[in-house]
Amino acid sequence: MGKDSLATVILALMHHEPLDEIVYCEVMFDKEISGEVPEHRTFIYETAIPWLRRAGLNVKILRANTTYKECFTKTIQRGKGKGKLKGFPLCGRCNIQRDCKVRPIQKYMKSLPQDTQQYVGLATDEQDRLMRLQEKQISLLEQYACSESEAWELCHRYGLLSPVYDFTDRNGCWFCPNATLPELRHLYDHHPDLWREMLALQALPNKATEKFNRELRFSDYDILFHNEDAQLCWFTQ
């Protein structure tokens, strides 16, 4: 539930577009820990959802039957990686996005009337993604010529801008392989418990993938940030 999705809701209300309910799918790290950056999860449940409900909207919360950790530790059954743990998802081919977010939404959509239309939070300056919209998917941001920066302003005006946008211009799971360096640094500095969870997964043997993303292992980022802090400490002495 990022700025583009919330800006879509605001536009729908402003322009009296039909809107039956808000569907939010929460990706989970394990059965207890959310995949949302903690500050963002607090924003969703304590600010965004109450605001939506006060506006008279029904909010449907979905979760997949599987989690990031279960996908990570699942044993590959065939192919050259047979017998290994799946390990870190591949950038550009993220099985977590597919299994933990897309599938629950698709399953829920099948329970709705066939003519149900889905609003998707894609701004006018995301043309590559807009080109991939499927039948019965609509971007109100495109329809009302709203860019990503304008979506940011709209959410800010209505008190619906998540605090994660203080340190990143995107919204993703805290274990996402597309996470930027500032996002990872924020996790390292402010959520050491979650950081340790990822280091524990990195330490598991017999993984099909060892790198967290295209460039580095998660443990490499741990060394990087540790060295940065040590250097800063040396300069301040």
Model-derived regions, located:
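Nucleotide-activated chemistry modules centered on ATP-dependent adenylation/adenylyltransferase
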Residues: 1-237
